[in-house]
Structures are given as structure tokens and as C-alpha cells.
Amino acid sequence: MYAFFTIFIGGGLGAVSRHYLSVYLMRMTAINAPWAILLINLLGCLGIGFFSAYLSRLTHAQLWQWFLLTGFLGGFTTYSTFTLNLIQLGEIHLASAFLNLFLHLGGGILCCFVGFWLARAV
């Protein structure tokens, strides 16, 4: 039951954080939804890389792993919204859709690697 509630609370907080951060980014900058989701997903990749490496060094980190990795970052990042935004962007401008796809995948892998590297340096 600990896992259920820990993931449930983390996922809810992650989803709400994603929503408000995307609204904030779109209001405070000139970017639209696909690019706001890109930034959020990259931040999430950095976070999941960092926290997975950092928490793996702790002996009693299972609740934190459930809360942060599965829950919060699972709710914060979103593959389904990414794919929907990608298709919508592709209907408007195909080159931008491919750029967005490349930045999500390449940037996500890079950010996850940097997160691992940062955690090992701490």
C-alpha cells in the first residue's frame, strides 16, 4: 500500500506541476504548447537521470524512488501529450515537427546522461 499512495501522490503533484509550468512558460515567453512540453520533458529527463543515480546510492530510498521517479516525474513528463503535440505541429509545419522530435529524443537522452553525471559528481 505504501507504493500505491506514494506513487499516487507523486504522480498527482507531477501532473499539476507540468500543467502550471506549461501555462507559465506559454504566458511568459513566446513559445507555444509543443515547445513548452519539450522544455518540461527535458527537465524531467534531467531530473530522472539525476535522482535515479543519486537515490541508487542510498540504502533506504525505495519510497523516494516511487515518489520521485515513478510518481512525480512520471506525472510531470508526458509522452502522450508529446505525441499529440507532435502530430498537431506536423499538420502546420512538418520541418518544425521533425525538429521537435529530434530535440525531444536527442535532448532527453543528453539530459538524462547529464543528470547521471551530476549525481555522480555530488
From Swiss-Prot:
It is found in: Cell inner membrane. One of its GO terms (molecular function) is metal ion binding. Na(+) binds at residues 74, 77. The chain crosses the membrane at residues 1-21, 35-55, 67-87, 98-118. Its main location: membrane. It catalyses: fluoride(in) = fluoride(out). One of its GO terms (biological process) is cellular detoxification of fluoride. Belongs to the fluoride channel Fluc/FEX (TC 1.A.43) family. This is Fluoride-specific ion channel FluC. The gene is fluC.
